[in-house]
Regions:
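Extended catalytic-interface subdomain
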Residues: 221-222
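Solvent-exposed residues in well-ordered beta-strands and their adjoining turns
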Residues: 67-69, 152-154, 182
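Mature, function-bearing regions of proteins
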Residues: 80, 84-87, 194, 198-217
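Conserved catalytic core of two-metal-ion nucleotidyltransferases
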Residues: 169-204
Length: 222
């Protein structure tokens, strides 16, 4: 994918070129002096596209986040780069790919979630602790960790089965299941708000959060 076409959608994973890291360190001396960030760069681990500030959006910068593991304080490092600093751009890992990194106690619920996504035509992708543990090999998961998922917004006739299926699995799973349904443009709504049939929901976009009607979100995504 050409760098100029790199998406700025939330939940996108990117890696930086060597020149991109050098530019990021030159722009922010505190970032350059952080040994945890330096180690991240040396390993070539991905970063995740986050919501942009108004200044970042106006400047056309790509807003990124780096969630450091609990062993170094579980800090969330924010930076932004030019589009030509990106080496690769890709989706979050699929649930099927990361399942082996999850605790044994989670496995039955994960299999149910995979089957639910397949029935509804929308495979689950993973962010949060499970994703970062799989991506980096570092320990992120703990006894109180949630499972963070995103699903593409399904066809209208499959929306209720997906939401109600998530609620049923969440009710019996050993971990809390959190996450969003995403439109094609990357805007997302927490699945619990949609499952509760609230008339208005919090829509998270690339640049902010706004209250919209649930119907507007689901209809505009198709």
């Amino acid at each position: 994918m050409p760098h100029a076409d790199a998406p700025r959608r939330r939940h996108t994973l990117v890696t930086l070129t060597a020149a991109g890291w050098r530019a990021a360190f030159a722009r922010d001396p505190l970032l350059a002096a952080d040994p945890c960030v330096r180690r991240w760069a040396e390993h070539g681990w991905p970063l995740i596209v986050r919501r942009a500030s108004p200044d970042e959006a106006a400047a056309g910068r790509v807003p990124l986040g780096m969630p450091l593991p609990p062993s170094v304080g579980k800090r969330r490092v924010a930076l932004n780069v030019a589009a030509d600093a990106l080496a690769t751009v890709g989706p979050l890992p699929a649930l099927a790919d990361v399942r082996a990194a999850a605790p044994d106690a989670w496995q039955p619920a994960l299999r149910e979630l995979e089957a639910l996504g397949a029935r509804c035509g929308v495979p689950a992708h993973v962010f949060g602790s499970l994703a970062w543990q799989w991506l980096t090999g570092e320990t992120y998961l703990g006894a109180s960790s949630d499972l963070d998922l995103v699903f593409p917004l399904p066809d209208a006739d499959r929306l209720a089965p997906l939401l109600d299926g998530l609620a049923a699995i969440d009710a019996r799973a050993p971990m809390r299941i959190d996450g969003e349904l995403l439109r094609d443009d990357g805007a997302g709504v927490n699945w619990r708000e949609l499952q509760a049939r609230l008339p208005e929901v919090a829509l998270k976009t690339a640049t902010g959060v706004e209250l919209v009607s649930a119907a507007l979100f689901t209809e505009a995504g198709r």
